[in-house]
């Protein structure tokens, strides 16, 4: 008997009936003490559940931050600065709408990568005809090169301003730096290595955010009402050069390469879950850890997809949206109404204007933000280029050589422009890259819409056995057909006929995870809007419309 319990009194038979209530009272006392003891020892279930959810969410932090880097590269600087200097805060609405569209496309990318286990490029190779696949590969490489131009330009300019490094040498330094980091990134390696790499990129993102937070304190922003009213639609968005600048913001925000990146960074955590829970058995003979035959289980998708999408959306609507809005707000506060020709200013001139209108520190912080964002964007752009070349084509050369070649092809035009035209060449390359990306976006995004709406592609087998998770065919999933899977079943001894196979294992059951009707219609509308607006902007350029980007 514990110190908190009371022994019931033993009554005589003749008095038992009259005193049952006394024993009941003692029993109530014991029950009360036991309840208090359990309440003291056990933590609150609600708080414990919240802590567990936060810990689980923390394991998924990383991919969303890497994707958000794609939406705050030097191309965004150029368009946001032009918009802020010309219309002050009125085009914040365009930044907000562009961010919503980008988030919607990334939602589709995450679903495609999780359900199929393949990125967008690999799905193109597996499901599209050869000719169309090659055409899309060429367009994707053009998008990678155009994006890389902007990243290299931003980094080279920031190195030139901060450390007086010649532009040509700055371009070369960006190549060396990105290659070193890229060679250290192994998407099929251990999760520890992947998380270290993601932490490095996240650090650059955080530094960029810190720089613009400081920049906002430097700037004289004016009434808060004026800033927040910029997030509402106004005539400035749809009239004159405001419409063109809004389209430029859209083209600089919804980047083609981010679609390949967003669909290719979700697999490691799915694979980690399947390995831990016995749904996937890696081939011990695969020394390169390629995991080419991996297909996520339904359990892994159900467990991780929600956290993946949540982390992605939080990153886009906090980090990416904040940085893009901060660029426009700072430029609007300092350059709008300036006697200097801010609309025609390049990044060099923007630095000089910030130094003269605010302070030397404000200009330096702006260039530091440009350096951090240029470096991080260059890294993720090169990763996207790797996914494109490996997904569309089955290169047999070593990964290091393949990545080096991809990066070299991307920076060659930029290096030539620097050597031939110098500073003006860099500015021209930055502006031209945004036009090219606007033209390529509809073609690159169309397959994403098709794949995520296909019931045949977006399905997951529910009754997959763990033994079948390890495939005997060395052919990658992107190259495998239904005939290959049938042959594999026969080689594993699971019947050479449909009757024999039905006796060994039940018929496969699939879960449809394709887009619903509402999402499909919304995706088509968004695609048509982006395509139409981009075409309108390009039409303006061809007819001689002056738009300073």
From Swiss-Prot:
Residues 12-22 have a biased composition (Polar residues). GO terms for cellular component: late endosome; mitochondrion; plasma membrane; trans-Golgi network; vacuolar lumen. It comes from the Eukaryota. The chain crosses the membrane at residues 91-109, 130-147, 161-185, 196-214, 312-332, 350-372, 432-452, 521-541. It is a multi-pass membrane protein. Keywords: Cell membrane, Manganese, Membrane, Metal-binding, Transmembrane, Transmembrane helix, Transport, Vacuole. High-affinity manganese transporter involved in manganese uptake from the extracellular environment. Belongs to the NRAMP family. This is Manganese transporter SMF2. The gene is SMF2.
């Amino acid at each position: 008997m514990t110190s908190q319990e009371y022994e019931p009194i033993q009554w005589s038979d003749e008095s038992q009936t009259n005193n049952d209530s006394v024993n009941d009272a003692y029993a109530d006392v014991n029950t009360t003490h036991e309840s208090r003891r359990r309440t003291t020892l056990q933590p609150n279930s609600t708080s414990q559940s919240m802590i567990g959810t936060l810990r689980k969410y923390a394991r998924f932090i990383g991919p969303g931050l890497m994707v958000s880097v794609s939406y705050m590269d030097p191309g965004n600087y150029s368009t946001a600065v032009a918009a802020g200097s010309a219309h002050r805060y009125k085009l914040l609405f365009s930044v907000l709408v562009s961010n919503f569209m980008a988030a919607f496309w990334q939602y589709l990318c995450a679903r495609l990568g999780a359900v199929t286990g393949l990125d967008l490029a690999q799905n193109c190779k597996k499901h599209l005809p050869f000719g169309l696949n090659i055409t899309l590969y060429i367009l994707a490489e053009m998008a990678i090169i155009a994006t890389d131009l902007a990243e290299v330009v931003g980094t080279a300019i920031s190195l030139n301003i901060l450390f007086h490094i010649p532009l040509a040498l700055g371009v070369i330094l960006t190549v060396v730096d990105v290659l070193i980091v890229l060679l250290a990134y192994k998407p099929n390696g251990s999760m520890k290595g992947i998380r270290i790499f993601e932490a490095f990129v996240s650090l650059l993102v955080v530094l960029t955010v810190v720089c613009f937070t400081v920049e906002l304190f430097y700037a004289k922003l004016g009434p808060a009402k004026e800033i927040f009213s910029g997030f509402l639609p106004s005539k400035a968005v749809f009239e004159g050069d405001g419409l063109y600048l809004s389209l430029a913001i859209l083209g600089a925000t919804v980047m083609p390469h981010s679609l390949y990146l967003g669909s290719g960074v979700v697999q490691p955590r799915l694979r980690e879950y399947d390995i831990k829970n016995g749904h996937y058995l890696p081939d011990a003979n695969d020394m390169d850890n390629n995991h080419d035959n991996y297909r996520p289980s339904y359990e892994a998708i159900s467990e991780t997809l929600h956290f993946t999408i949540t982390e992605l959306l939080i990153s886009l609507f906090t980090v990416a949206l904040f940085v893009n809005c901060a660029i426009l707000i700072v430029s609007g506060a300092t350059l709008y109404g300036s006697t200097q020709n801010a609309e025609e200013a390049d990044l060099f001139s923007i630095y000089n204007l910030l130094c003269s209108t605010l302070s030397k520190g404000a200009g330096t912080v702006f260039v530091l933000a440009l350096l951090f964002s240029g470096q991080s964007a260059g890294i993720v752009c090169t990763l996207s280029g790797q996914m494109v070349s490996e997904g569309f084509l089955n290169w047999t050369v070593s990964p290091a050589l393949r990545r080096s070649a991809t990066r070299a092809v991307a920076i060659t035009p930029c290096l030539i422009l620097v050597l031939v035209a110098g500073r003006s060449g860099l500015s021209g390359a930055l502006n031209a890259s945004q036009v090219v990306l606007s033209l390529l976006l509809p073609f690159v995004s169309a397959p994403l819409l098709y794949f995520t709406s296909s019931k045949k592609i977006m399905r997951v087998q529910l009754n997959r056995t763990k033994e079948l998770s390890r495939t005997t065919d060395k052919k990658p999933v992107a190259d495998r057909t239904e005939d290959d899977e049938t042959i594999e079943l026969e080689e594993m001894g699971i019947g050479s006929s449909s009757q024999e196979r039905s006796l060994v294992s039940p018929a496969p059951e699939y879960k449809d995870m394709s887009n619903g009707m509402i999402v499909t219609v919304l995706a088509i509308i968004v695609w048509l809007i982006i395509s139409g607006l981009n075409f309108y902007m390009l039409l303006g350029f061809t007819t001689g419309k002056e738009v300073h980007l």
